[in-house]
Structure formats: C-alpha cells, structure tokens
A protein has these predicted regions:
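Alpha-helical bundle segments that constitute or directly flank the non-heme di-iron/ferroxidase center
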Residues: 1-26, 48-59
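Acidic/histidine-rich alpha-helical segments that form the ligand environment
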Residues: 7, 11, 75-115, 130-135, ...
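Short acidic/polar alpha-helix capping motifs at helix-coil junctions
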Residues: 4-7, 18-22, 64-67, 79-83, ...
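Solvent-exposed alpha-helix faces
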Residues: 13, 20, 46-47, 99, ...
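Short, contiguous alpha-helical
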Residues: 28-73, 117-170
Length: 170
C-alpha cells in the first residue's frame, strides 16, 4: 500500500465526526484575526486537495522531473481564498476530490511510481513517496487544528476553575 494512503482514506470520516453538530458560530469562530476558523481550515483543505496535492501527484506521475511551484497557503489566505465560504459546501467539494484522489492512488503501481521525482521550487528534489507522507501529515495537522479550535471554543470557556490547569493554543 502506498505510504499515507490509509490516513488519506480515514480523514473524511474523522472530519465528519468532528464537524457533526457544529454550529455556524463555532464554524466561523477565530481565536485571533490572523488565525483560521474551522470553516477556513475546511476550505483550505478543499483548495489544496486539487491545487496542491493532486496537481503535484499528476505532474510527478506523468512527467520526468517536473518543476513545481510552492503552494503558499498564507498568500492564499491573505487574498481571502479561504474566507466567506459555506463550510458544508467546502466539505462536500473536498470530499468529492478526496474520493477521486483515493481511487486514483489505489490505481497506481506503487513500485512504478513511489520513487518518481519532481523539482519543488523551494525544497528541491522530492519523490512521490515524500509527497504522500506529507499529504497524510498535512491531514493530521489540520485534524489537530480543528480539535484545538473546538476544545478552546466549545469547552474551555465553561470549565470554571479547571481553566487554571490548561493553556489551549488554537
């Protein structure tokens, strides 16, 4: 099995569980003006799924040592790419892309593609294996981010004296 594929397959269910019962206020709450809301995290996942991960994967599988631009999430965020979108629409779009990407990845011959390379503009030479591991790592980072936003906003304010023993960092 390709590295990271099991995590990529599991992420939709994990996110579905985290988003179940989420109010609009919770979805759009930001701990600070320069931090992302849960809705923005989901829109980022939707955008990077196709414009980052799948695009790079296609380039490396189809071409010999393609040159790949950096995906600058902070620049996209500053331009409002992740803001003002409906979280359900963003999730549905992401999930459709993820389903297609899983089918694509399952169809690859691991031995034939795992060491294929691309030239990232900042990182230099990367392999399909590197990208797959980063993709799973990226999923897990945003799962952690959503968990921290939820616990900081939904539960921490209502913990009374227990707040003194925790320092949430959303």
């Amino acid at each position: 099995m390709l590295p990271g594929l099991a995590q990529l397959e599991n992420t939709p269910e994990i996110l579905r569980l985290l988003l179940d019962g989420l109010s609009g206020e919770e979805a759009n709450w930001k701990p600070a003006p320069d931090r992302w809301s849960i809705a923005e995290v989901i829109e980022h996942l939707s955008h990077v799924e196709g414009h980052g991960f799948r695009s790079r994967m296609d380039q490396m599988v189809e071409s010999t040592l393609p040159e790949m631009l950096e995906y600058d999430q902070e620049a996209f965020a500053a331009k409002g790419q992740y803001s003002g979108r409906d979280i359900e629409d963003s999730f549905d779009h992401w999930e459709d892309q993820r389903d297609a990407n899983i089918q694509f990845l399952r169809g690859l011959d691991e031995a034939a593609v795992i060491a294929r390379q691309g030239k990232h503009e900042r990182l230099g030479i990367i392999t399909v294996g590197d990208l797959l591991n980063e993709w799973a790592f990226h999923d897990m980072g945003h799962i952690r981010q959503i968990l921290e936003l939820l616990r900081s906003h939904r539960y921490y304010p209502n913990m009374g004296r227990f707040q003194s023993i925790y320092r949430p960092a959303p």
